[in-house]
Amino acid sequence: LAMAQTAPPSRAPFIIAPTVEGLMVCDEATQNLALLALDKVLADCQARKAHGAAALKRLLDTLEPGGPKGQVQVGYTATLELLKLYRHTPKGWVIDDAKVSALLDLIAQVPRPVVLYLSAGHFDSQGAIVAELEKDPANWMQLADGKPPALGYFGYRILPYTLRTDASIPVNRYRFEALRYVARRVKALPKAVQERIVAFTLAGELHHLFPDFENGMGAFQNIRVTDYHPASVADFRRWLAREYGSVQTLQERTGLAYPDWDSVPAPAKD
């Protein structure tokens, strides 16, 4: 009887969160017919300290009139490109507080659930800092032929950043610094605004490893799938040493005989 009287546990609503482009495009700029390029539109909105909250509300209200309610709710995914946050100053590259503030203010003004996508992968290629990062080979991955892949995605630039996690590598240092900064800003939001953020995602994709990605979506052979930069290969060997302890143990467990760790090749088979 007691079990029958116990209320079932409440279930969190199912959130539909489509990625919405142009979140920082404000209504005022779209009404200015002299602004033809997106970067000009965004600069105008930033100067006004405006964003696309009003347009976002209108869009989501067409999908779920009356606001989010019930067991299935419509929200959105907001993408924040971490490297794109940086601006150059006489003291070097610093995070532009205004860019982060604009997105967080949009989240505060739109009473909808949101997934915050902190993007720092190969599609984070449009920021001013990228031109400097390109000059340092340490920031790039390499394929087995010793060269970084050179691909685009339907006109959008793709940059093959290293797969290493070494925080001293410049691209990683900037990415990690931006990640920590955004985390601090989110933590400082009012609780009601924080609770609108139903999830964080760092989702990455492997487009930059696909041969002829735009045309080769169905390819399953000759796929190049890892980072053969010498430093990455050295990381692989150090991992083997931690995992097996000695080359003798490696041979006992795998049947592979090498005189030392430096002789172990990185995986190279399809």
Q: What is each model feature region?
A:
Residues 27, 125-128, 209-212:
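Short acidic/His/Gly/Ser-rich catalytic and metal-binding motifs that mark active-site loops
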Residues 49-159, 167-190:
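Aromatic-lined substrate-binding rim segments of carbohydrate-active enzymes
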